[in-house]
Amino acid sequence: MEKNMIGKISQVMGPVVDVDFDGYLPIINEAIEVNINLEGTQTRLVLEVAAHLGDGRVRTIAMDMSEGLVRGMNATATGSPIKVPVGEKVLGRIFNVIGETIDDGEQVTDAPMWSIHRQPPALVEQSTTTEMFETGIKVVDLLAPYSKGGKVGLFGGAGVGKTVIIMELIHNVAMGHDGLSVFAGVGERTREGNDLYHEMKDSNVLDKVALCYGQMSEPPGARNRIALTGLTMAEYFRDEKGLDVLMFVDNIFRFAQSGSEMSALLGRIPSAVGYQPTLAREMGALQDRITSTKNGSITSVQAVYVPADDLTDPAPASVFAHLDATTVLNRKIAEKGIYPAVDPLDSSSRLLDPQILGEEHYNVARGVQQTLQKYKDLQDIIAILGMDELSEDDKNIVERARKIEKFLSQPFFVAEVFTGSPGKYVSLADTIKGFKMILSGECDHMPEGSFYMVGGIDEAIEKAQKMK
């Protein structure tokens, strides 16, 4: 190690640390390591260069708590950005922002190491074809389909099933596509991260997923950069292995929030609502790397927390510009016992177009939405006057809409433990066939209950015969 790559800490302000170098100037985003002896244990603290202050002094952001740092301590420049392990060895493991495993297992030492700061694929490398990504979940595939290499926003409050949908998607991608997933917990509750790990272990999907956690309790640097750590692992599988990878970010709002904290600590002038002036650029730099190339794709599902339910807040607004589809979870649907509690009228997708999906899929999806909307409009009349006052046509619409509502429910593989009914993966062709039959009136003779918590329409027909 060159002597002049060793600097001295000159100032510590919480997570912001200034380091003086003589003769060597670390570049922006370069990692600097400090060895701290805290209460008899040696720990490695990584700092990331955020600004040059002049005269060989750099301002850095700490990737962990800065307790134990003192002025005059040695800090060693590494000559490169933070590097994390990638490849097969990361599957089934939990990592922190600097690529160390935090799951009590052995550290990953013999895997390729990639920098977390990377350029997005060149324009000529990117794939321009729009292709649907089949999830095996009826309501998603029919009404708000995901695109390969696209970005999906998962909106929902606490306890409506965001995590269960994420786990089911990981399971179905592993089963239906032989694909891999990467989960980045950005500013997550530590308890939720722990629950997710154990639930994945119990559902046998852990060996197909890499987990990266930067919890709420960590400094803003770790919460911000953890999204890049997870994305780098996903990029390896896309670029080197040619796979279709699913990338989960929970929660993308915390990425913007931690960026705003870092910006304030670095002394930048805040922008609207106190956010960092570079919010759109930071969000764009992350989202730009999530894309399809001619080799493989990264499809991302991002949980979006909306502060105070204000969709015009700059953080969620900066995410919307990048999304191809939105899956909205609704508490009222969950209260009816219909899971997944996806709102069929609020969820949307830019793929819902006859030129992309074909006429049949498009017409069935629109027919389902029209029937459900008409039922919603008739509910006030039903509440006041009862069903008897409706015309025959309206009665048919109400009955079909109730069957559609029930048929949008589906038993999940990862929820078998709670529901006791085996999970179902429903192919797109079966999904379209089932809803087409309900809309055309072929299922008018079947009882409503036969559509609840089944896979395809054939299963509902079998159930109806048993109920007679």
UniProtKB/Swiss-Prot annotation:
Its EC number is 7.1.2.2. It is a peripheral membrane protein. It holds the Pfam family ATP-synt_ab_N. InterPro entries: AAA+_ATPase (IPR003593), ATP-synt_VA_C (IPR055190), ATP_synth_F1_bsu (IPR005722), ATPase_a/bsu_AS (IPR020003), ATPase_alpha/beta_chains (IPR050053), ATPase_F1/V1/A1_a/bsu_N (IPR004100), ATPase_F1/V1/A1_a/bsu_N_sf (IPR036121), ATPase_F1/V1/A1_a/bsu_nucl-bd (IPR000194). It catalyses: ATP + H2O + 4 H(+)(in) = ADP + phosphate + 5 H(+)(out). One of its GO terms (cellular component) is proton-transporting ATP synthase complex. ATP binds at residues 156-163. Disulfide bonds: none annotated. It is found in: Cell inner membrane. Its main location: membrane. SUPFAM superfamilies: C-terminal domain of alpha and beta subunits of F1 ATP synthase (SSF47917), N-terminal domain of alpha and beta subunits of F1 ATP synthase (SSF50615), P-loop containing nucleoside triphosphate hydrolases (SSF52540). One of its GO terms (molecular function) is ATP hydrolysis activity. F-type ATPases have 2 components, CF(1) - the catalytic core - and CF(0) - the membrane proton channel. CF(1) has five subunits: alpha(3), beta(3), gamma(1), delta(1), epsilon(1). CF(0) has three main subunits: a(1), b(2) and c(9-12). The alpha and beta chains form an alternating ring which encloses part of the gamma chain. CF(1) is attached to CF(0) by a central stalk formed by the gamma and epsilon chains, while a peripheral stalk is formed by the delta and b chains. HAMAP family: ATP_synth_beta_bact (MF_01347). Produces ATP from ADP in the presence of a proton gradient across the membrane. The catalytic sites are hosted primarily by the beta subunits. NCBIfam families: atpD (TIGR01039). Belongs to the ATPase alpha/beta chains family. This is ATP synthase subunit beta. It comes from Sulfurimonas denitrificans (strain ATCC 33889 / DSM 1251) (Thiomicrospira denitrificans (strain ATCC 33889 / DSM 1251)).
